[in-house]
């Protein structure tokens, strides 16, 4: 039964043979562990991979294979993916011009919720997990305090212009409660990432810059551009150490080149 089930992964809609090989190997490993694809077995299998100290990237591949296979079985399963720690690359942060271009694009859509999502991320420096807890009432009131990473309390302020825009929009469309809600319920990291990639393509923005955390980096870079107080920024970002925050003072390749050409005139 196992070999027959594993072969089924090859009939999924996978465009590249290399991808099929990866998925086939992943499912083979799964069926060496369990006889049936169900949520309990899948969770135990993922836990066993973590105990083997496999990299988050490898585990994510295994999860993708299982999800595709479960879809083929017409018993779709969605599993939680381990996070891949992103190393900050100052070249992969949206520029102010790109940020404004994205906002203009989203503002022109029938559903302006996503315009507000980007505006909030770009003006608060919130992590996605914090952003998911904001309410429309928080934004309209101008601030909120949340218990976040490491059981620390963090206060978020909302820009006056954003408050006013949100107040008008919420009244017109009856928006209340949890802020980050899409067509199918609360926004997930995966769903939001997919939206960002599509929007980035429309706006001509590099896909490497189109992930939720990039707007936290954008906020930090913009804040330091206006205010050199790294200690205050560390507090706003909820960093335990100022050393973590100092990385935002680094300049991108384009910024360095521009500064060089402006200053080296002798």
Indicate where each model-derived feature is located.
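Single conserved hydrophobic/aromatic residue that forms the stacking wall/gate
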Residues: 1-12
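N-terminal core-binding DNA-recognition domain of tyrosine recombinases/integrases
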Residues: 10-90
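DNA/chromatin major-groove-contacting recognition/catalytic segments
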Residues: 157-161, 167-169, 250-266
């Amino acid at each position: 039964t196992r070999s027959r089930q594993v072969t089924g992964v090859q009939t999924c809609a996978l465009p590249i043979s290399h991808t099929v090989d990866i998925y086939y190997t992943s499912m083979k490993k799964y069926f060496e562990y369990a006889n049936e694809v169900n949520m309990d077995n899948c969770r135990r299998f993922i836990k066993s991979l973590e105990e083997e100290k496999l990299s988050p990237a490898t585990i994510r591949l295994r999860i993708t294979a299982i999800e595709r296979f479960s879809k083929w079985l017409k018993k779709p399963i969605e599993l939680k993916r381990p996070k891949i720690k992103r190393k900050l690359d100052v070249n992969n942060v949206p520029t102010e011009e790109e940020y404004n271009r994205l906002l203009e694009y989203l503002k022109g859509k029938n559903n302006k919720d996503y315009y507000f999502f980007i505006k909030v991320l770009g003006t608060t420096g919130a992590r996605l997990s914090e952003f998911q807890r904001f309410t429309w009432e928080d934004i309209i009131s101008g601030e909120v305090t949340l218990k976040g990473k490491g059981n620390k309390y963090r206060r978020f302020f909302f820009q006056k212009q954003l408050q006013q825009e949100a107040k008008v929009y919420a009244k017109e469309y009856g928006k209340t409660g949890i802020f980050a809600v899409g067509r199918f319920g609360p926004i997930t990291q995966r769903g939001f990432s997919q939206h960002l990639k599509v929007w980035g393509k429309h706006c001509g923005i590099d896909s490497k810059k189109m992930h939720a955390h990039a707007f936290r980096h954008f906020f930090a870079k913009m804040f330091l551009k206006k205010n050199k107080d790294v200690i205050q920024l560390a507090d706003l970002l909820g960093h335990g150490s100022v050393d973590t925050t100092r990385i935002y003072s680094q300049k991108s390749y384009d910024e360095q080149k521009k500064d060089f050409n402006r200053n080296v005139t002798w």
